[in-house]
């Protein structure tokens, strides 16, 4: 269940081979108790740099046992909450931003919608940038760009998602903005998990993926670029 093990195991000797000359003594039972390993302190070097780039990994540290987990920073765009609620977060470390399209049909969201949308990829320092395009900077899950994923699938609209300059520089060769590289994404509930349909804004047929909640993690991530899932946050 993702929690540190704690409890006890009882061992009891029921019989021995008399033909071998063994006999059960007065001590027939033994109790083995165990509890989580607690760190007494120390030093830990965070492996955020893989040598190729300075900020390659997101690193999570378990202070109880001096261990760390590295996750490739660019391995996911969206994170799906594994708690009781149905929430989606943006990977701010990969400069992912999103804005609602107000449309529920995949094919209805087109490149024209992206062209008419606010320039969400303008950058946080732009005068036109809106805090509504990113998640709450203090981590409040009730204040995310996607909002709560509604139980009624028809109430969930497509989000137009992009990345800020420098994430992977989503531009044309002449350095002008290329909104055809933006994505459209719709997330609905799928039992106790999620169903995601997504694609480039010009696509007419969506790619779909189902994401199950994993109680060991806070979030399961999805890369819009590769379609791969990743355990995004321990």
For each of these PLM feature ranges, what is it?
Residues 3-234:
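Surface-exposed, beta-sheet-biased, low-hydrophobicity segments with strongly acidic/polar composition
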């Amino acid at each position: 269940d993702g929690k540190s093990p704690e409890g006890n195991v009882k061992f009891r000797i029921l019989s021995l081979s008399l033909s071998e000359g063994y006999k059960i003594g007065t001590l027939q039972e033994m109790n083995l108790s165990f509890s989580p390993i607690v760190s007494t302190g120390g030093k830990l070097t965070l492996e955020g740099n893989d040598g190729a780039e300075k900020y390659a990994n997101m690193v999570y540290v378990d202070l109880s046992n001096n261990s760390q987990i590295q996750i490739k920073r660019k391995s996911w765009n969206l994170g799906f909450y594994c708690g009781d609620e149905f929430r989606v977060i943006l990977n701010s470390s990969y400069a992912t931003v999103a804005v609602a399209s107000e449309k529920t049909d995949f094919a209805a969201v087109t490149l024209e919608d992206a062209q008419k949308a606010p320039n969400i990829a303008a950058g946080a320092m732009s005068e036109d940038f809106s805090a509504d395009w990113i998640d709450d900077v203090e981590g409040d899950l009730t204040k995310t760009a996607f909002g709560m994923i509604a139980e009624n699938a028809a109430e969930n609209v497509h989000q137009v998602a992009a990345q800020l300059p420098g994430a992977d520089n989503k531009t044309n060769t002449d350095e002008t903005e290329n909104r055809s590289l933006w994505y459209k994404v719709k997330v609905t509930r799928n039992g106790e998990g999620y169903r995601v349909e997504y694609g480039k804004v010009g696509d007419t047929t969506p790619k779909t993926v189902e994401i199950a909640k994993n109680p060991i993690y806070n979030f399961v991530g999805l890369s819009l670029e590769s379609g791969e899932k990743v355990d995004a946050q321990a």
